[in-house]
Amino acid sequence: MASEISFAIPGEPCAFARAGANGKRRYTPPKQASFMAAVKLFASRAMAGAAPMQGPVEMTVEAIYLAPASWSKTKRELVFWKTSRADADNIAKLVSDAINEIVFVDDAQVARLSVTKHYGDRSVIIVSVRSMECCG
């Protein structure tokens, strides 16, 4: 069992979205489904066959967005935090749901959560999960 892992998912961060409906059938939006599959893939690689973590865990999610091309160089240098959509809690929900049973047994184990959204030189989500079992 790993006590701490980190991994990065390249590409534009995606947030958890409410399931869509088509008549009587409900479906997961395609963008969300493909992003969840990518998160699962990178999490599985990071775990390298280790058993999921037991007990309380701390999860850190850093969502980095590429600044819009329409922004001037000055604005790109001045603006760091991303305050528009997607919501930070929905990004964390998508990640925790995707890594459920891969990194930890159940996402209810997440006892401490930190999520940041900001602009950077590439679009990526960086995820770190650490067991709090021994140290608190």
Task: List where the protein language model places each region.
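Acidic, proline/glycine-enriched N-terminal capping motif
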Residues: 1-136
